[in-house]
A protein has these predicted regions:
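Mixed-charge interfacial surface used for oligomerization/domain docking
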Residues: 1-11, 17-27, 31-153
Length: 153
């Protein structure tokens, strides 16, 4: 593309993240572009945003972890049958840390709220909730966060 359009500027942002953080970065980029910010200012703001995000995710299915070799297939099958849930987070270097295991949806959602408290979530920054096949859990989390007042999307 640069060969055909050398006047174009390209910035590649590695968020070391997924899901809501990517949506948040896209929203921020769109907002800053709409405000006619300079290219360099937009790049700086996006990098700062990526460095400040926190990612927590809960898994109820171990199928994909088993398929890509992160867990043994038998272990994944048994964990699913036992209604196991794992809570994961992004480490500063972008790796996945599965740091909490429990049985049942309620316990893992409670741990998400507890972790947000431990991370000193201020209730000011938006919380982006995304789900894949578990809208009920997303709604429960949404309602649990509602009293604290963050912008929820």
């Amino acid at each position: 593309m640069l060969e055909e359009h050398p006047e174009k500027k390209i910035f590649v942002l590695d968020t070391l993240s997924c899901s809501g953080a990517l949506a948040g970065a896209a929203e921020l980029a769109n907002k800053l572009i709409g405000e006619d910010q300079t290219f360099d200012d937009i790049c700086f703001a996006l990098k700062k945003f990526a460095d400040s995000t926190h990612i927590l995710f809960a898994l109820a299915s171990f199928d994909n972890l088993a398929k890509n070799g992160r867990v043994n297939r038998v272990v994944g099958f048994i964990a699913g049958r036992l209604n196991m849930r794992v809570l994961g987070r992004r480490t500063p270097d972008g790796k996945i840390d599965f740091y909490f295991k429990t049985r049942g949806e309620t316990r893992v959602l409670a741990k998400i709220l507890e972790q947000m408290d431990e991370d000193k979530y201020d209730g000011v920054h938006p919380v982006l909730i995304s789900e894949c096949g578990n809208q009920n859990a997303a709604q429960l989390l949404h309602h649990a966060l509602r009293p604290s007042g963050p912008a929820l999307r």
